[in-house]
Amino acid sequence: LYALKLACEELLAQRADVMVAGGLSRPDCQYTQMGFAQLQALSKGGRCAPLSAVADGLVVGEGAGFFVLKRLNDAVAAGDRILATIAGIGLSNDRGANLLAPRSEGQLRAMRAAYRQAGWRPDDVDLIECHATGTPVGDAVELESLHELWRESTGPS
């Protein structure tokens, strides 16, 4: 997400016409497993169950994703095949909170920034892709943050 945010900023500031942004995770199995084991974040059952009542931790995996980004006007003018647009992007952290005990405050700051930049309300969005690591505390805080965002938008539930 951070790479996408930086790429968007470069495009909006006219410092670049095309940006490639993305990331990969190819953890060194021994060190990554040891680190997450020390944090007690690994699933004891070896299965990640995001947003589930039986979630007990995460499972380390590998992945990669990259995006070619242009300003919409430039992509249209070039006849590019446009798969998606980024209307708003937000980034925040919990300012010193424990890695395994996230707080809603930082998550809400990021979501509010993205919605504000896009000029949208939460009910304008059809799909939310959650972080959802499968850690009971992290997933619960993420759901709490989303609930609060919608409550602000629609009033008490």
Descriptions of predicted regions:
Residues 1-157:
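Condensing-enzyme catalytic core of the thiolase-fold
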